[in-house]
């Protein structure tokens, strides 16, 4: 039985319905993404809270095992031990490419710069809205302003994302820390937040050489 209790990627859509009841707007994303977007105490406080909302979390152990299987299969395909099977997977990216090539028209939700389709968010901020795909063209579809009831929740995250992008462009770790400590899921004290941030930077330092030159 492929349900939320034995599939980390499944849910009963309880978070979606709770947000709809509270804010009067239906969310497009699944419960796992919605939960991580909201303040941590709402749906991710502890394992018991997660379980009560009927969705699963992907464990580190699962990620490691999944990567191991993918690498092993890649090796079998490379050596010819396993023959590739060509079929339709349902991946929408294929349909998006077909539309851009002019083989069809498509309207779907994608991450694109805000060109005014959400008027009360900053222009240029990356937003997930519907867009019309056609030959050599991806045009955002007007979505309208965010309702007042959810504007503070989304505008805060949008502002933090702008901050972290600027930190990356400026190679400014202090700016990155400011964004980190303001994340809705950050509920540590300032000293503990700094300690965690510094540990994360230290453990990924080999990938961050440009920040230390």
Q: What are the roles of these predicted feature ranges?
A:
Residues 1-213:
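Long, compositionally biased stretches enriched for glycine and/or charged residues
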């Amino acid at each position: 039985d492929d349900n939320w209790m034995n599939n980390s990627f499944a849910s009963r859509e309880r978070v979606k319905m709770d947000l709809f009841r509270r804010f009067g707007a239906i969310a497009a994303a699944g419960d796992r993404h919605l939960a991580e977007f909201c303040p941590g105490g709402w749906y991710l406080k502890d394992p018991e809270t997660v379980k009560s909302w009927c969705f699963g979390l992907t464990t580190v152990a699962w990620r490691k095992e999944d990567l191991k299987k993918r690498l092993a299969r890649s090796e079998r395909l490379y050596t010819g031990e396993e023959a590739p099977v060509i079929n339709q997977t349902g991946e929408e990216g294929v349909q998006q490419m077909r539309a851009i090539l002019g083989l069809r028209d498509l309207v779907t939700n994608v991450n694109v710069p805000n060109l005014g389709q959400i008027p009360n968010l900053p222009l240029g901020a990356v937003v997930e809205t519907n867009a019309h795909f056609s030959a050599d063209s991806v045009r955002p579809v007007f979505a309208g302003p965010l309702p007042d009831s959810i504007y503070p929740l989304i505008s805060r995250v949008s502002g933090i994302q702008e901050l972290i992008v600027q930190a990356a462009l400026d190679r400014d770790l202090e700016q990155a820390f400011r964004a980190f400590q303001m994340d809705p899921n950050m509920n540590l004290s300032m000293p503990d937040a700094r300690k965690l941030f510094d540990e994360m930077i230290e453990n990924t330092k080999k990938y961050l050489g440009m920040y230390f030159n």
